[in-house]
Amino acid sequence: MAALPITWKAGSDVQTYEKARIGRVFNHRRPDRYPIAVIEAKEESHIVEAVRLAREKNCRLSVRSGGHSWAAWSVRDGAILLDLGQYKQIDLDEKTGIVQVSPSTTGRMLNGFLTTKGRLFAGGHCPDVGLGGFLLQGGMGWNCKNWGWACEQIVAVDVVTADGQQLHCTEHVNSELLWAARGAGPGFPAVVTRFHLQTRPAYKHMRSSGYCYANADFQKAMKWILSITDGFDPDTEVVLVASYPPGSEGIVHTVLFVAFKNDPEEARRALQPAQDSHPAGTVHEWFNRETSLQDQYKDQGAANPEGHRYRVDNAYISNDADVASVLEEAFTTLPTKKTFSLWYSMSPGTRRPLKDMALSMQTDHYFATYSIYEDAKDDDLASSWVKKVMAGIERHSEGAYLGDSDFQVRRTRFWGEKQGVKLMELRRKWDPKGTICGYLDEGDKSQQNGLANVHEWSAKL
C-alpha cells in the first residue's frame, strides 16, 4: 500500500495547501472554509484510511469527486477533505454491459471508453463533471425525460461506511445504502468507492435541430415547445435556453432538439414535427444537423466555462403553472452576457412510477439559471438577480434538484415527504456520529439532522 497522500493545513506551505483545498473547485467564488487536511486518494486503501483517520482525529470527513458543486460542498471547516480526483477506474463487463467506475470518472471519460465498445451511459451533459456527485444527486442525464434518471441505472455501489467497513450494496444486500445512493446527494452517509452502472447500446446517428428567437418572442417560443413536447419522439431530448450567443447584443431563445438514433432517416423523421410546426420569425435555425456526443460535450463546456464565478439556482415548476409567465423574467432579463437560463422537458418520464429510491422530486418542467461572470465586483449583481427571479418562481414550484442548489442560500423540498424522512433516518443510522459531512446549509449547522425538506419560503408568507 502506498503512503497516504495527505496535505496538512498546519505545517504545509500556503501554495501547496491552497492548491489541494481549492485547486479542483470549479466555481471561482472561492469558499472561506478551511479543512484541517486534504487527502488525494490514489487507491481504495487510501479511502479506507481516510475514514479511519477522521474517526481517530474526532473530526468530519468531506468527499470531492470533482463536479461543479456550485457551493463547493466538499470544502468544510475543521474536516479532512478526501479528494478522489486521482483515484481512477473504468472496467466493462461486455457480457452484461455493466461498467464499474470510480466517482471521479467524468461523463466524457466514460463515454470515450464506452464508445469503443459500442456502449453508452446517459451521464451528465457537462463533460467535466465527475460521476460521483452527479449520480448521488439523481443524475439528470442525456434524454432524462425519456430514458429516466441516471441513478436508476446504478446496479450496485461499493462503499466505505462511516465506521470504516467496506460493503457491497445491491437491491438485496445492504439495500438501504443503494436506496440512498439513488438521490441522497451530498448527504449520503458513506463514501462511494465504485459505481456499478448498466450501460445501453450506443447510437450510430445523432442529429440536432435548433430554432432561435429574439427576446421579444420568448412567449411564442415557450408556448410552442410546451405544446409539442409531451408526444415528441422518445429518443429526443428537448430544451429551451435563453442566452447571449457569441457576438449577439440581445438575448436569444433557442429551442434545441437532440435525437439519438441508429438510422439517419429515422432521426430526420423524429425531428420533422418540430420543423413543420415551429413558429415563423426565427433569427437563426437549423434542421437535422449531424452531431455527436463529443460535439455536444464541447458545446456544454463552452456554455459552462472554467475560471468563472457562478451563482446558480433551480426549481421544478408545478405541472399546473402558467410556465411561460412564471419563467418570463428569468429568461428575458439575464444580468450578464455569459448567464443563461434553461427549461428542460421532463415529461413523459415524470408520468411513470419511479423506482423505490431516495430520488423522488420531479415535475414536467425543470428550470435552472446560471449567472456566470468573471469579476468579483459582480457578485452582488449576480446574487441579487438570482434571488429576485427565484422569489417569484419558487411559489410556483414543487421543489428543487440537488445538483443545481446551494442550501446556504435557499432551502426547499428536495424529496417526497416519505422519502425525505426515510433518508434522514438512514443518515443517522449509518453515520450516528456525523463523521461524513452532510448537507452544507447556512453556517454548516445541519449535521446529522440533515435538511428539513420543506418550502422555507412558505413560512414567510
Segments (PLM) and residue ranges:
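Soluble FAD-dependent oxygen oxidases
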Residues: 1-461
